[in-house]
Swiss-Prot record:
SUPFAM superfamilies: Ribosomal protein S5 domain 2-like. The lineage of its organism: Eukaryota, Fungi, Dikarya, Ascomycota, Saccharomycotina. InterPro entries: Ribosomal_Su5_D2-typ_SF, Ribosomal_uS9, Ribosomal_uS9_bac/plastid, Ribosomal_uS9_CS, Ribsml_uS5_D2-typ_fold_subgr. It comes from the Eukaryota. This is Small ribosomal subunit protein uS9m.
Length: 279
């Protein structure tokens, strides 16, 4: 058997045994050329997007490390410190669910160090880099269209409570209140409902200085009264935006989302159960 195999080897030329070697080398070279290269150098880290940002910021910090940072003896005020992107805002570009609070604090620390460089020694590269991490809320606030008084000097606002909704027109006057074309006392027989409507005005000591015209629908009497209260508070802010803080602290600018809990099957009410009987 071994003699037969030796005779077969003698019959096969040597070139036939070596022809595959150059093909393998060519194939390996082609694979090496077509290999996919990751876009980020930090591709194999736990959070590639965040590490890429940190590498760029730290490289910029090392580049300007010889420049003297500002040495301020007194504490900076809140207006001096820039408003960086919040954790949720930075997570959109910093790794989404992979971002950890420690990584975010690390980013803010480096941003603060870059911001601490003396403006006279800083350049456009630093400013452009920091601008990408600033909050855009200030620009958004400038684009918000503020409500204004109409040509008759009225402020219009809409308030809601439970299933009730109210549209209120507020104008300076002698304190007259009309609800769906009816007088204040005629529409709301309960004193607590009337007090709820006048509460925003009492917070500002402005009772009797504004006329209120309300169109309300849906829900019960108490829900309608609180919907009007919510609308009156929003209309007062249209008259003077500086009153927003006082009204917000009084709790009349925030809508009350509480609703009656629905009844469940097998229960007498939402949670009340029938008395348990052994037999």
């Amino acid at each position: 058997m071994f003699a037969r195999m030796a005779s077969l080897r003698a019959l096969v030329p040597v070139r036939a045994l070596l022809w595959r070697a150059p093909v393998r080398s060519v194939h390996r070279a082609a694979v090496r050329e077509t290999r996919i290269v990751p876009q980020l150098p930090t591709f194999y880290s736990a959070n590639p997007a965040h590490e890429a940002h940190m590498d760029r910021l730290e490289a910029l910090l090392r580049k300007h490390t010889k420049q003297q940072a500002r040495r301020v003896a007194v504490e900076r005020t809140a207006s001096d410190r820039p408003r960086w992107l919040s954790f949720d805002q930075y997570a959109l570009i910093g790794g989404t669910s992979r971002l950890k609070p420690t990584q975010y604090r690390q980013l803010v620390s480096v941003l603060d160090r870059l911001h601490a460089i003396d403006p006279q020694l800083s350049n456009g590269e630093i400013a452009a880099t920091l601008e990408a991490f600033l909050r855009k809320s200030r620009l958004e606030e400038q684009n918000v269209v503020r409500q204004e008084l109409d040509h008759l000097g009225r402020a219009c606002a809409v308030g809601r409570r439970k299933t009730s909704s109210a549209k209120v027109w507020l104008v300076r006057g002698s304190g007259e209140v009309l609800v769906n074309g009816r007088t204040f006392a005629d529409y709301f027989s309960k004193i607590k409902d009337r007090d709820a409507i006048m509460y925003p005005l009492r917070v500002l000591d402005a009772a009797g200085k504004y006329n209120i015209f309300a169109a309300v629908r849906g829900g019960g009497v108490t829900g309608q009264a609180e919907a009007i209260m919510h609308a009156v508070a929003k209309a007062l802010v249209v008259f003077n935006p500086l009153l927003k803080t006082r009204l917000h602290r009084a709790g009349v600018l925030t809508r009350d989302y509480r609703h009656v809990e629905r009844k469940k099957p097998g229960k007498r009410k939402a949670r009340k159960m029938p008395a348990w009987v052994k037999r």
